[in-house]
Swiss-Prot record:
Its main location: secreted. This is Pleurocidin-like peptide WF3. Antimicrobial peptide. The lineage of its organism: Eukaryota, Metazoa, Chordata, Craniata, Vertebrata. The gene is ple3. It comes from the Eukaryota. It comes from Pseudopleuronectes americanus (Winter flounder). Belongs to the pleurocidin family. Residues 48-61 form a propeptide. Keywords: Antibiotic, Antimicrobial, Secreted, Signal. One of its GO terms (cellular component) is extracellular region. It holds the Pfam family Antimicrobial12. InterPro entries: Antimicrobial12 (IPR012515).
Amino acid sequence: MKFTATFLVLSLVVLMAEPGECFLGALIKGAIHGGRFIHGMIQNHHGYDEQQELNKRAVDE
């Protein structure tokens, strides 16, 4: 009887949840966002070095 009640309650919780509230979806979106952030930081770091070199040239002139 406990198993049946637990199954029914959990089924209702799953069915009443909004489609956008998926826990796995949030994890996947977070991982993608984190990967893009890290990639952007790496790419911006290379641009930062180039900008520093240009700034040194501008000051020297």
